[in-house]
From Swiss-Prot:
<keyword id="KW-0694">RNA-binding</keyword>
<dbReference type="Pfam" id="PF00398">
    <property type="entry name" value="RrnaAD"/>
</dbReference>
<dbReference type="GO" id="GO:0052908">
    <property type="term" value="F:16S rRNA (adenine(1518)-N(6)/adenine(1519)-N(6))-dimethyltransferase activity"/>
</dbReference>
<keyword id="KW-0489">Methyltransferase</keyword>
<keyword id="KW-0808">Transferase</keyword>
<feature type="binding site">
    <location>
        <position position="12"/>
    </location>
    <ligand>
        <name>S-adenosyl-L-methionine</name>
    </ligand>
</feature>
<dbReference type="InterPro" id="IPR001737">
    <property type="entry name" value="KsgA/Erm"/>
</dbReference>
<dbReference type="InterPro" id="IPR029063">
    <property type="entry name" value="SAM-dependent_MTases_sf"/>
</dbReference>
<dbReference type="GO" id="GO:0005829">
    <property type="term" value="C:cytosol"/>
</dbReference>
<comment type="similarity">
    <text>Belongs to the class I-like SAM-binding methyltransferase superfamily. rRNA adenine N(6)-methyltransferase family. RsmA subfamily.</text>
</comment>
<feature type="binding site">
    <location>
        <position position="14"/>
    </location>
    <ligand>
        <name>S-adenosyl-L-methionine</name>
    </ligand>
</feature>
<protein>
    <recommendedName>
        <fullName>Ribosomal RNA small subunit methyltransferase A</fullName>
        <ecNumber>2.1.1.182</ecNumber>
    </recommendedName>
</protein>
<keyword id="KW-0949">S-adenosyl-L-methionine</keyword>
<keyword id="KW-0963">Cytoplasm</keyword>
<feature type="binding site">
    <location>
        <position position="60"/>
    </location>
    <ligand>
        <name>S-adenosyl-L-methionine</name>
    </ligand>
</feature>
<dbReference type="InterPro" id="IPR023165">
    <property type="entry name" value="rRNA_Ade_diMease-like_C"/>
</dbReference>
<feature type="binding site">
    <location>
        <position position="39"/>
    </location>
    <ligand>
        <name>S-adenosyl-L-methionine</name>
    </ligand>
</feature>
Length: 257
């Protein structure tokens, strides 16, 4: 099954058998699992996941690939293919009381907004394993003070624990991307954050990192005054990249003290 990659869909197909096996080993699918694969593409990972005996829901936007996947996997395993945009897909419609294990080689051009879309559905997700641009994985896994630390780092940490698993070179794909990729594991916290907390933390984080070269005293002006920052135990002279998730949660609580 060979498909001409479409640039507008951000298609870079994984072709390296060794990397595919590494991903499957990292996921460790079991027959009792309910898997969701985002962007199955040519089905190379799909095939290996199905061999575990797990139930697999595949979400693919490219109608030509959907048709090819249906032909290739007709009568194979427990597979259901959904033609549609993962950015608009509601996982709760297929969760039916079960938590989902989500995997995929995500299109790099929409990876960050897609991650936030999935975070909004974190209550039905058991874990996630994704191939992403290495820079995005570095941001997901960064802690306060790290070079890659930013808005994505803080918001991801609010929802889950991120773990960088391994890097993947451009030569493992067709066509070859211009960047190094990496596989990340995201495990949601036992208790997901409530919508109110997410909204407040996001407001503080966006303001802080929107002017990251400024001190919080200036970056958060109009949102929080210095008294509120001190009350939260935060130095108004600090900068966005110096604060941990706990610090941002503390600041967010000062929005409605």
């Amino acid at each position: 099954m060979r498909h001409v990659p479409r640039k507008r869909f951000g298609q870079n197909f994984l072709r390296d058998p060794g990397v595919i096996q590494e991903i499957v080993a990292a996921v460790g699918p079991a027959p009792s699992d309910r898997l969701v694969e985002i962007g199955p593409g040519e089905g190379v990972l799909t095939r290996e996941l199905l061999q575990s005996g797990a139930c697999l829901e595949a979400i693919e936007l490219d109608r030509d690939l959907v048709a090819a996947l249906k032909r290739r996997f007709a009568g194979v395993g427990r597979l259901r293919i959904h033609e549609g945009d993962a950015m608009k897909f509601d996982l709760r419609t297929i969760a039916t009381g079960e938590r989902l294990r989500v995997v995929g080689n995500l299109p790099y051009n929409i990876s960050t907004p897609l991650l936030f879309h999935l975070f909004d559905q974190i209550d039905v997700i058991e874990d996630m394993h994704f191939m992403l641009q290495k820079e995005v994985v570095d941001r997901l896994c960064a802690g306060a003070g790290d070079d890659h630390y930013g808005r994505l780092s803080v918001m991801a940490a609010l929802y889950c624990q991120a773990q960088h698993l391994f890097d993947v070179g451009p030569e493992c794909f067709h066509p070859q991307p211009k960047v190094v990729s990496a596989v990340v594991r995201l495990v949601p916290h036992a208790v997901p954050p409530d919508a109110g907390m997410v909204k407040q933390v996001s407001a503080v984080v966006v303001a802080a990192f929107g002017q990251r070269r400024k001190t919080l005293r200036n970056a958060l002006k109009g949102l929080l005054d210095e008294t509120a920052m001190v009350r939260a135990g935060i130095d108004p002279g600090a900068r966005a990249e110096e604060l941990s998730l706990a610090d941002y949660v503390g600041l967010s609580r000062q929005l409605n003290p």
